[in-house]
């Protein structure tokens, strides 16, 4: 592959519809817009979701659910990610943030058991899954809930 062989992704670029001059051009007179009507006008066209006056789908379907104001959003960290730290390191939410493992603290950090931990670490977090807690302790490390 060379620079001059690069092509934009399919459908990412749209060719501007050029208006013809005269009927013979195939795109003159009404410029492909047909005769009169809303779509022939400047700025014409219906809004998103408009179905010609029929009750639109989004209004025919019932509302569902609610937003729980007490919901807690935890930053998730898997065991396999903890292997990047040295043996005997005290892993805290601040350290995870500093090293770029998590992008923001949200309502705390939760450690999940995806992957395996091979190092002896002291892990401090807000929540642990039971299997993650067992795996850290089995590797000789310790777990502390903040």
From Swiss-Prot:
Key words of the record: Ribonucleoprotein, Ribosomal protein, RNA-binding, rRNA-binding
Biased composition (Basic and acidic residues): 1-13
Any one of the GO CC terms: cytosolic large ribosomal subunit
Gly residues compositional bias, start-end: 21-31, 42-52
GO biological processes: translation
MF terms (GO), sorted A to Z: rRNA binding; structural constituent of ribosome
Alphabetized NCBIfam families for the sequence: rplO_bact (TIGR01071)
Function: Binds to the 23S rRNA.
Protein name: Large ribosomal subunit protein uL15
């Amino acid at each position: 592959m060379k620079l001059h062989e690069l092509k934009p992704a399919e459908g990412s670029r749209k060719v501007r519809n050029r208006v013809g001059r005269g009927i013979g051009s195939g795109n003159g007179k009404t410029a492909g817009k047909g005769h009169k009507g809303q779509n022939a006008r400047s700025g014409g066209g219906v809004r998103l979701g408009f179905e010609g006056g029929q009750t639109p789908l989004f209004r025919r379907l019932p509302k569902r659910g609610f937003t729980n104001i007490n919901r807690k959003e935890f930053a998730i960290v898997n065991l396999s990610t903890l292997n990047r730290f040295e043996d005997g390191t005290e892993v805290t939410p601040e350290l995870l943030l500093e090293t770029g493992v998590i992008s923001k603290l949200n309502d705390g950090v939760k450690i999940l058991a995806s992957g395996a931990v091979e190092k002896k670490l002291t892990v401090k977090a807000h929540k642990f899954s039971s299997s993650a807690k067992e795996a850290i302790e089995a590797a000789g490390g310790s777990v502390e809930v903040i």
